[in-house]
């Protein structure tokens, strides 16, 4: 996997075959794509199946690993060093854009919020209120920072909860939302 965040690249290599081309990949990213920096996030267990150690770190000169990006009109600070996978799920771009069509004037709950991307898109789209929850305090802190970056802190809030624990309780308490976003982590690894 190669993810591009402005002029910075994050690579994640899971197989022995691609691992042998790491240096060439970095060289091409720097020389042909003018990468300002390349960071490796091959800190995944699937590498062990191929007899590879997990790896994480700079493949060029060090740089600030909090990279600001804009997607669908929403600003994010992506933590490519400590965020999940490569720091941001770029493949969800169109799903985040689709949120705009259903959230205006609604109360929204975003479970497993991670960087707050779905919650922030709901806020930008004009949601009445948004609550994003995640089991990781680090994720909640990053999402809160992203809400502040977009001046959405009055509408979009984040709390540290395990969705599996609180959803049943909230249902019994009568808490209701107009839109509930569920994007849980993978339950099985391929």
Residue ranges and their predicted role:
Residues 61-190:
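Rossmann-like S-adenosyl-L-methionine
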Residues 1-7:
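Short intrinsically disordered, low-complexity coil segments enriched in acidic
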Residues 3, 21-88:
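Non-catalytic substrate-recognition/targeting regions of SAM-dependent transferases
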Residues 16-18:
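Helix N-cap motif at beta-to-alpha junctions
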Residues 14, 43, 185:
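Flexible loop residues that form catalytic
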Residues 8-13:
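Carbohydrate-binding surface patches
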């Amino acid at each position: 996997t190669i993810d591009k965040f402005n002029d910075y690249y994050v690579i994640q290599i899971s197989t022995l075959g691609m691992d042998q081309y790491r240096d060439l990949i970095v060289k091409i990213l720097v020389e042909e794509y003018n990468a300002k920096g390349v960071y490796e996030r091959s800190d995944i267990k699937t590498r062990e199946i191929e007899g590879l150690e997990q790896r994480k770190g700079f493949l060029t000169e060090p740089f600030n690993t909090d990279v600001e990006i804009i997607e669908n009109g929403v600003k994010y600070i992506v933590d490519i060093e400590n965020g999940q996978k490569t720091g941001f799920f770029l493949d969800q771009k169109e799903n985040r854009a689709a949120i705009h069509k259903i959230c205006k004037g609604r109360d929204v709950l975003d479970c497993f919020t991670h960087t707050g991307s779905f919650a922030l898109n709901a806020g930008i789209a004009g949601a009445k209120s948004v609550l994003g929850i995640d089991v990781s305090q680090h994720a909640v802190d990053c999402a809160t920072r992203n809400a502040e970056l977009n001046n959405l802190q009055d509408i979009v809030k984040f709390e540290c909860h395990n969705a599996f624990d609180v959803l049943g309780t909230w249902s019994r308490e009568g808490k209701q939302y107009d839109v509930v976003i569920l994007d849980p982590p993978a339950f099985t690894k391929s």
